[in-house]
Curated annotation (Swiss-Prot):
Protein name (record): Glial fibrillary acidic protein
InterPro entries in UniProt: IF_conserved, IF_rod_dom, Intermed_filament_DNA-bd, Intermediate_filament
Coil 1B: annotated span: 116-214
Organism, as annotated: Pongo abelii (Sumatran orangutan)
Region feature (Linker 12): 215-230
Predominant subcellular localization, coarse grouping: cytoplasm
Example GO molecular function: structural constituent of cytoskeleton
SUPFAM superfamilies membership: Intermediate filament protein, coiled coil region
Described purpose of this protein according to its UniProt entry: GFAP, a class-III intermediate filament, is a cell-specific marker that, during the development of the central nervous system, distinguishes astrocytes from other glial cells.
One Gene Ontology term, aspect cellular component: cell projection
Subcellular location: Cytoplasm
This protein's encoding gene: GFAP
């Protein structure tokens, strides 16, 4: 009976942070005590999935870059060839000119040095003139800037004076209006006093007439009742008294009217003088305002020209800033493309490093398994047809201090013509 010992072990393991992946065990799942693992011939690890769309895009970008570089290289080659031809042509011309110069020198001495010295003196003189003109223009510019500051200060002062004059004019106008209102009030009072005087005169005349009528009636009554006594003296005395009283009242009213009229006349004269002064000052302020307005217009024109020059300077600076921004954007794009390419290379390097780490871990695991085996694997080539399945159970113990203790049980099955003849188990301890 032919005996064949079949011992095979194949597994994949990945250890990270105290976790282990064996065979088809999901990543991140821990092995508990008494876990039974079936170790058999496993297929080789599948390659990492590749994003072909990204690879195609990178390949297309690489092709475009290579095409642009090739076109640029061809253009540079053409330019270099044309440059070489031009250099050769200039060298030939230089040789011809050198030969002609030698011929001229051989014929007779020239005065080129004197001609060049004269031209150099002229150029130096022009340079000195331009330097002097530049200095003069700078001085004029500084003077104009100083004059501009002075004019601006003067404009501010004149503006303040104009505002003050306008305020004073408004105050004078208000005073003139008040004087006009006072004059109108005095005129109304004068009219009311004249009406009162006329009313008093009318009342006085009526009183005199009534008194005369009363005297006449009393005289008639006395003449009828008495035997015509002589009342002429009494009537004359009474008439004299009333006339004196009326005359004194009239005189007092006229005096009061005259005093009131004189007061009103003086007030009107004073108000008229104030109004005349206000009008004169208003005319002066108006003339000053016109002159200040002319100065303001001239300064406004100067200010507009300076603002126009400033806008032109700002526009030129804006264009330069825009060009600098565009150059900066291009540089940032190039930097970003370089960063992306570097990130891609780093990702590729990280993937390769992960693959290397996984391979190192698998190699270490295989080495541990092979060291734990007592018997070597001897499988003849012709017995692969009778090869069945070999089961291996793997028991794990507790994990302590970052090391994983495992009991590896190797089960050996002897088969013949598809029938199991003998089974044996061997237990090995392994610490990782």
């Amino acid at each position: 009976m032919e005996r064949r010992r079949i011992t095979s072990a194949a597994r994949r393991s990945y250890i990270s942070s105290g976790e282990m992946m064996v065979g088809g065990l999901a990543p991140g799942r821990r092995l508990g005590p008494g876990t039974r693992l079936s170790l058999a011939r496993m297929p080789p690890p599948l390659p990492t999935r590749v994003d072909f769309s990204l690879a195609g895009a990178l390949n297309a970008g690489f092709k475009e870059t290579r095409a642009s570089e090739r076109a640029e290289m061809m253009e540079l080659n053409d330019r270099f060839a044309s440059y070489i031809e031009k250099v050769r042509f200039l060298e030939q011309q230089n040789k011809a000119l050198a030969a002609e110069l030698n011929q001229l020198r051989a014929k007779e001495p020239t005065k080129l040095a004197d001609v060049y010295q004269a031209e150099l003196r002229e150029l130096r003189l022009r340079l000195d003139q331009l330097t002097a003109n530049s200095a003069r223009l700078e001085v004029e510019r500084d003077n104009l800037a100083q004059d501009l500051g002075t004019v601006r200060q003067k404009l501010q002062d004149e503006t303040n004076l104009r505002l003050e004059a306008e305020n004073n004019l408004a105050a004078y106008r208000q005073e003139a209006d008040e004087a006009t209102l006072a004059r109108l009030d005095l005129e109304r009072k004068t009219e009311s006093l004249e009406e009162e005087i006329r009313f008093l005169r009318k009342i006085h005349e009526e009183e005199v007439r009534e008194l005369q009528e009363q005297l006449a009636r009393q005289q008639v009554h006395v003449e009828l009742d008495m035997a015509k006594p002589d009342l002429t003296a009494a009537l004359k005395e009474i008439r004299t008294q009333y006339e004196a009283m009326a005359s004194s009242n009239m005189h007092e009213a006229e005096e009061w009217y005259r005093s009131k009229f004189a007061d009103l006349t003086d007030a009107a004269a004073r108000n008229a003088e104030l109004l005349r002064q206000a009008k004169h000052e208003a005319n002066d302020y108006r003339r000053q305002l016109q002159s200040l307005t002319c100065d303001l217009e001239s300064l406004r024109g100067t200010n507009e020209s300076l603002e126009r020059q400033m806008r032109e300077q700002e526009e030129r600076h804006a264009r330069e800033a825009a060009s600098y921004q565009e150059a900066l954007a291009r540089l940032e794009e190039e930097g970003q493309s370089l960063k992306d390419e570097m990130a891609r290379h780093l990702q590729e390097y990280q993937d390769l490093l992960n693959v290397k780490l996984a391979l190192d871990i698998e190699i270490a695991t295989y080495r541990k398994l092979l060291e734990g085996e007592e018997n070597r694997i001897t499988i003849p080539v012709q017995t692969f047809s009778n090869l069945q399945i070999r089961e291996t159970s793997l028991d794990t113990k507790s994990v302590s201090e970052g090391h994983l203790k495992r009991n590896i049980v190797v089960k050996t099955v002897e088969m013949r013509d598809g029938e199991v003849i003998k089974e044996s188990k061997q237990e090995h301890k392994d610490v990782m």
